[in-house]
Amino acid sequence: MPRLILIRHGQSQWNLENRFTGWWDVDVTEKGAAEAFAAGKLLKDKGVLPTLAFTSLQTRAIKTLHLALEAAGRLWVQEDKDWRLNERHYGGLTGLDKAETAAKHGDEQVKVWRRSFDVPPPPLEAGSEFDLASDPRYDGIAVPATESLKDTIARVLPCWEEKIAPALRAGETVIVSAHGNSLRALVKHLSGISDEDITGLEIPTGQPIVYELDNDLAQVERYYLSER
């Protein structure tokens, strides 16, 4: 039976500071690193051991993956880094304090930007301090100026179809270390969650979510490993 492990990166510095992060590259905090290592230890203790790994091009997800694999005794597994697993791009909100943004624009407007399915935040200005167009990791990639959750799903699902799903069908136990919104995309697809309901799904940092799938990759069971 194919098995998929999803893990959101451990707490990042901007999670701690309550800032919009998106594609900007911030590191995990000491707490975030501990969350990642604890997740890997849980994988080892429960015997849920990945044989193949996928992650984004962002440090917080990559480091979470490595710490979890180290704790699980699985640093040797092959990993694939794919930009399509990056967090949703928060456009012109990138770097802003969430509370200050709400005070400036109003709670309802910020809620629409954060939690609507298909309304993106204002675009990031070209040449701003958070413009990643010249970042070497994105050579050949059209870096978005902003994204809605719908936009994020539209890039995550081809990664699923091209890479992750074939690996599961081939018998791999796959771990995906990614971000709140890129993981929402996978959960929505696998669990058949509606556009409206997926926006309210919270995915905690550093907590492995396990999918037991049938041979057609339909969900048999979904659970937090810590609850088993």
Curated annotation (Swiss-Prot):
Give the EC number: 5.4.2.11
Q: Does the keyword Membrane apply?
A: no
**Which residues bind substrate per the record?**
8-15, 21-22, 60, 87-90, 98, 114-115, 180-181
Which BP terms in the Gene Ontology apply to this protein? gluconeogenesis; glycolytic process
Instruction: Give the Gene Ontology MF terms in alphabetical order.
Output: phosphoglycerate mutase activity
Locate the site labelled Transition state stabilizer.
179
Q: Which reaction does it catalyse?
A: (2R)-2-phosphoglycerate = (2R)-3-phosphoglycerate
Q: What does this protein do?
A: Catalyzes the interconversion of 2-phosphoglycerate and 3-phosphoglycerate.
Name the protein family.
Belongs to the phosphoglycerate mutase family. BPG-dependent PGAM subfamily.
Q: What is this protein called?
A: 2,3-bisphosphoglycerate-dependent phosphoglycerate mutase
Q: Which gene encodes it?
A: gpmA
